[in-house]
A protein has these predicted regions:
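Conserved ABC ATPase signature
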Residues: 149-153, 157
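The feature captures the beta-strand-to-loop junction immediately N-terminal to the Walker
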Residues: 48-50
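Conserved ABC transporter NBD signature motif
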Residues: 71-79
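Conserved catalytic motifs of ABC-family nucleotide-binding domains
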Residues: 170
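Short coil-to-helix segment of the ABC ATPase nucleotide-binding domain corresponding to the Q-loop/switch region
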Residues: 109-117
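Helix-to-loop junction immediately C-terminal to a conserved catalytic motif
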Residues: 63
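Catalytic Walker B motif of ABC-type/P-loop ATPase nucleotide-binding domains
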Residues: 174-177
């Protein structure tokens, strides 16, 4: 049985230009060099490497946050380079779950509101939001923390909150940039 293709990468290249204040020239740093791969539904893929080797750059590309220098990224068959910025934002909000190294929890929101945020942005019914948050909080051992602010919980608890937030909309793809 063939599985559905979620992500396809063709000849992905990402370079950065480094401009130095004490020099007249600029240097091009080649981070990703011609990557090709496919990710199918229900497939787990791990990307490992030394610090600074391009793992986060790759995840930002796969998450449609950063555009490649060249090459193609297809998400569920759609060529990301042909999509408008609002279409990319919709895909990121509805179909891709992110867990970042720094979590990016909003301290002005409670743990519950942070988990619920993707559903609220997607204009999901309020009762569904609360039901889903409570279910995820229960599964991840966070129920007792729902009314707390992110700055009141431990690093491990923040990571679990970020994971719940990434899963809450049942995305097609989950990207986790963790140490």
């Amino acid at each position: 049985m063939n599985k559905r293709e979620v992500m396809k990468v063709e000849n992905l290249v990402r370079n950065y230009k480094m401009v130095y204040s004490n020099r007249q020239d600029e240097e091009e740093i080649k981070v990703l060099k011609g990557l090709d791969f496919t990710i199918e539904e229900q497939e787990f893929v791990g990307i490992m490497g030394k610090s600074g080797c391009g793992k986060t750059t790759l995840l930002k590309g796969l998450g449609l946050i950063d555009k490649p220098t060249s090459g193609k990224i297809f998400f569920t068959g759609k060529d990301a380079s042909e999509l408008w910025s609002d279409e990319l934002a919709d895909i990121r909000r509805r179909e891709i779950g992110f867990v970042f190294q720094d979590f990016y929890l909003l301290n002005s929101l409670s743990v519950k509101e942070n988990i619920m945020l993707p559903m609220v942005l997607d204009k999901a019914p309020v009762d569904k939001c609360y039901k889903n948050v409570e279910a995820y909080a229960e599964n991840f051992g966070l129920s007792h923390l729902l009314e707390k602010q992110p700055y009141e919980v431990s690093g491990g608890e923040k990571q679990r909150v970020a994971i719940c937030r990434a899963l809450i909309n049942n995305p097609d793809l989950i990207l986790a940039d963790v140490n």
